Amino acid sequence: MFDLFQNLRDPEGGQHMLRRFRAMLSDGRHAFDLAITAIVSGGDPAAVREEVFETDQRINKNEQALRRELIVHASVRGTTAFPTSLLLMSLVKDAERIGDYAKNILDLARHKSVLSEEEQDLITPMAAKASDMLGRAARLFDSQDEAAAAAFLEEEHGLRHQCEAAIDDWIDDADKNHSAACLVTRFIKRVAGHAGNVVSSVVMPLDMLDFHPGGGGDED
């Protein structure tokens, strides 16, 4: 995929678009971390609600601006820019969805003692892993390191299976209601999937984007 980004890395091309995309990923991680901290700690979600929603609005505005810039970029550059524009148009949706999941998690945090201590202990490391993956996804997108990207996708696949296993165990537990824990873990799984989609752009052809083994954010 490296060749597709050459016209964006040109100072007269779309460096500002790449910076905008990186900002979306960074903001998504920030909102996700705030929401996870609120629900795991049992703290008052109102304390971070404004920041989470403002961050999500910033993500949305960047997505809209980036779409407009991609249209202009493709119009100026012609057909040679179409593959790059299609690719980045897809990836910005992955970045945008992370803010939505952060809001979903924060909504669950409104309920008192929504997670048991046991659930918190299982969810915390999975959420930390997903957050770390968001940061690494941005760096891999920049470096276009194919070997590191392939290793990342294997790791992402493992985290998603870990989330699925936890959800299966909670659903099979007839003695307790684990519905909130299942939802939070599902959101974590999808955040990891969106990070994987971004990284898949390093190693997958455009037509196979989002179809890396076990990957994806919303289709599963």
State what each model feature region is:
Residues 1-220:
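Cytosolic, long alpha-helical scaffolding segments
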